[in-house]
Amino acid sequence: MLVKVFSFFILMITMVVIGVSKEYCDDKQSCQNFLLELKAGSSSLSEIRRRDLLIIVLKNSVRRIDMVMIGVMDDTKQHEEMENDLLGVKEDTKLFEEMMESTKDRMIRSVEELLGGEFPNRGSYENVHTWLSSVLTSYITCIDEIGEGAYKRRVEPKLEDLISRARIALALFISISPRDNTELISVIPNSPSWLFHVDKKDLYLNAEALKKIADVVVAKDGTGKYSTVNAAIAAAPQHSQKRFVIYIKTGIYDEIVVIENTKPNLTLIGDGQDLTIITSNLSASNVRRTFNTATVASNGNGFIGVDMCFRNTAGPAKGPAVALRVSGDMSVIYRCRVEGYQDALYPHSDRQFYRECFITGTVDFICGNAVAVFQFCQIVARQPKMGQSNVITAQSRAFKDIYSGFTIQKCNITASSDLDTTTVKTYLGRPWRIFSTVAVMQSFIGDLVDPAGWTPWEGETGLSTLHYREYQNRGPGAVTSRRVKWSGFKVMKDPKQATEFTVAKLLDGETWLKETRIPYESGL
């Protein structure tokens, strides 16, 4: 008994020392249980520095994921004959395995960054914060997407356990924030080692020159090396730190394109957003899982899309149907058209930048949990299914420590020619998760937007915890006198507040965007 009391005493001292118990860890019981588990394998836990403890937690979590994957696969084989929806289970299993591999990759990269000599400058800190946030996003995506049934009942408790562990890791990480370290002021952060090197292929402002030096060419008329986009992507090297450019000539490419996370630093460049078109019509009505409906899904870090169209033609009656899903860190979409209806653009996770794009849809047509900034984009609401309202954003930040949010800056928010603004209401956003974070700044807002501006997801959920902001917008829809009265919504007056949602602050863009050679505005 004395041994147990002493162990628990040491545990509580440890938690106080590392600043987790009171200030950083919301789930106290999970923190205690997990740290007890770690204590069993470490006789000197109370003496370990916070960063070292976090590394232990992450390594432990990677091992846990391996155990969970093996257990789920074995369990699924044993119960396969009991499943009523084998096709759905196969789809769920594929998604589960993809998400688990993604989380392992992010945790391993986080450990490497924590062990690196640059930590904790601002650049390396934001890298780890991004990746650990994305781990939680992947787990939550699994729970959201896996269909109801025996498979989900077996998997969900394991996912809940992984979520608790990921939240503990994130809480530990927050406790070693460098923001109070004055020594960091003079540090110039660097891009992570896997981000592409700057060479002659990175002169993106000269699109014609870039096409001429592309690694491969795709053409419907036979003038390129490949006739399909997928064939060209298959030819790209794996785990490359050098940029691989694919030029896709004018044409309509009817195919489902998936860029795996083993193919970083990939550029797709077309002849223009009205000339090079990748299209499909998958929707939740025939594919079941929104995550898998994307016409183009990019999971690779450092992805860049230029001068092309990503289209989903499923239509307003088919439910969620993604045109473009982006799940890779430090991704850029430049001068592209994203065209769909519900959930048209899915910035799923990690850091993303959209510049001079045309984005059109209906319900939640910019949705996800990425850290994403949209600059100089045309955001166009179109006619939805009868009885529906349009909602532009559905940002899904689930926990306060997660690093995510959307900024719409210097964009035009308007109606398509087919939208009946007299009968269809359009809103700037609604909270997919309770800490949903969106800022609309310095933009033109047309009269299509309802005077309330924002709409609830369900009842009062998240209205006091969300972070919805507006700043210096103009146009008939920008009048804020009749906006919602939620405590989580604010009209910003102070430019210092608005600065927190800029490329430099929200996206940490100065550490990586300049390497892409895509134009951007760092501040207001």
Swiss-Prot record:
Gene3D superfamilies documented for this protein: Invertase/pectin methylesterase inhibitor family protein (1.20.140.40), Single-stranded right-handed beta-helix, Pectin lyase-like (2.160.20.10)
Site positions (Transition state stabilizer): 342
EC class of the enzyme, as a word: hydrolase
UniProt-listed SMART domains: PMEI (SM00856)
Location within or outside the cell: Secreted, Cell wall
Pathway(s) it belongs to: Glycan metabolism; pectin degradation; 2-dehydro-3-deoxy-D-gluconate from pectin: step 1/5
Keyword Signal carried by entry: yes
Entry-linked PROSITE patterns: PECTINESTERASE_1
Binding site for substrate: 290, 430, 432
A UniProt-annotated Pfam family: Pectinesterase
Alphabetized InterPro entries for the sequence: Invertase/methylesterase_inhib, Pectin_lyas_fold, Pectin_lyase_fold/virulence, Pectinesterase_cat, Pectinesterase_inhib_dom, Pectinesterase_Tyr_AS
Disulphide bridges: 357-377
Record EC number: 3.1.1.11
Name listed for the protein in its UniProt record: Probable pectinesterase/pectinesterase inhibitor 19
Organism listed in the record: Arabidopsis thaliana
Name of encoding gene: PME19
